[in-house]
């Protein structure tokens, strides 16, 4: 049962589910009936700073709906019709063995399978490197959870030490307090990793006592002797001073490794080369999901999703997090700055490339 009450330019709809009445305020605009929560979000939060007139937006939105909705319905009707034919075909033969040739012919007859076309070439331009040239992990995160979304966006860079220490890759029990023995196992694991991805010619990451930069090369000291990377091109940047860098940046397979040097840190002061952490580039892209991992049904649900996405796009999304009894604000990471071998400063992207996934034509 539905009841409606007119209030100026808005309609207040009430619908009953069981013994409960639910209210839905709507705005009438250009032939559309728009939920007031969504209407206010678009006008007051999404459109400002875009140089788009709200009146023009709603007018063009209505035009797009009027043009595309019939086409969308036609596609869905066609899909439903094909599905009914396939269902009927299988039901009729439920007690028979499927003849493959007969089945393929049937699928072609109903245009489920179409004839293969001539070979062709297609190219796209201006594709982000995270899609076109970098091979790396991709995450999927529900857009309605701000904390999860921020974590995923920030997952492009992370401490290799922390990741290993907190997982069962390193055997043994984990405690809330720092375990130096477990810490040494982590450091050994990372040194082996560096031996593989950025080997030192005739040397070892496990034996270095100092790292400096000279003539655009990394110099590793082992027993007062100098050693270099096997592939000197892997070293592309640093922070700090050449004689005392605070970090060195290495590139491998289009991904980056940031080796942090800090003699005053808990880890670095006990390390022969004062390496305190190794930050690796990992999840280069993230699917921000409006679909499988999210249940966004009504306007309030959807606006929550849209608001989080807007915050990600404007880079101002943040949320309060409580961890180990401590409160802090989680927000998007900044880009990472370095000094290049030419002496000029440059930046690497600090966040994952965000992709928005939705299936509006089905929802």
Regions found by a protein language model. Name each.
Residues 105, 111-363:
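Catalytic alpha/beta active-site cores
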Residues 13-15:
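Hydrophobic alpha-helical signal/anchor motif
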Residues 24-93, 97, 101-114:
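N-terminal-proximal low-complexity accessory segments that begin disordered
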Residues 1, 22-24:
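Initiator methionine at the very start of the polypeptide chain
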């Amino acid at each position: 049962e539905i009841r409606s009450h007119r209030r100026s330019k808005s309609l207040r709809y009430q619908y009953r589910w069981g013994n409960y009445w639910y209210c839905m305020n709507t705005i009438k605009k250009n032939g559309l009936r728009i939920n007031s929560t969504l209407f206010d979000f678009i006008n007051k939060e999404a459109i400002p700073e875009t140089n788009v007139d709200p009146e023009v937006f709603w007018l063009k939105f209505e035009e797009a709906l009027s043009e595309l909705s019939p086409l969308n319905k036609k596609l869905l009707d066609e899909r439903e019709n094909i599905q009914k034919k396939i269902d009927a075909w299988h039901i009729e033969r439920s007690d028979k063995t499927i003849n493959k040739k007969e089945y393929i012919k049937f699928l072609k007859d109903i245009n489920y399978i179409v004839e293969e076309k001539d070979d062709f070439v297609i190219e796209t331009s201006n594709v982000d490197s995270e899609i076109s040239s970098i091979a790396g992990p991709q995450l999927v995160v529900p857009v309605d959870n701000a904390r999860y979304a921020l974590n995923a966006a920030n997952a492009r860079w992370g401490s290799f030490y922390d990741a290993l220490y907190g997982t069962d890759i390193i055997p043994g029990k984990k405690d809330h307090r720092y375990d130096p023995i477990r810490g040494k196992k982590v450091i050994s694991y990372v040194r082996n990793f560096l031996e593989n991805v950025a080997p030192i010619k005739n040397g070892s990451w496990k034996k270095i006592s100092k790292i400096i930069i000279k003539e655009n090369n990394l110099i590793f000291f082992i027993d007062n002797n100098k050693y270099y990377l096997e592939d000197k091109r892997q070293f592309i940047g640093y922070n700090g001073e050449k004689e005392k860098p605070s970090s060195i940046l290495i590139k491998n397979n289009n991904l980056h490794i940031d080796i942090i040097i800090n003699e005053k840190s808990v880890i670095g002061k006990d390390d022969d080369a004062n390496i305190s952490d190794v930050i690796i580039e990992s999840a280069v892209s993230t699917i921000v999901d409006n679909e499988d991992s999210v249940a966004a049904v009504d306007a309030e649900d959807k606006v929550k999703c849209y608001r989080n996405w807007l915050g990600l796009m404007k880079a101002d999304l943040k949320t309060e997090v409580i961890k180990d009894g401590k409160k802090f604000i989680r927000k998007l990471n900044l880009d990472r700055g370095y000094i290049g071998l030419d002496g000029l400063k440059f930046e690497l992207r600090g966040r994952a490339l965000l992709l928005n996934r939705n299936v509006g034509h089905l929802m």
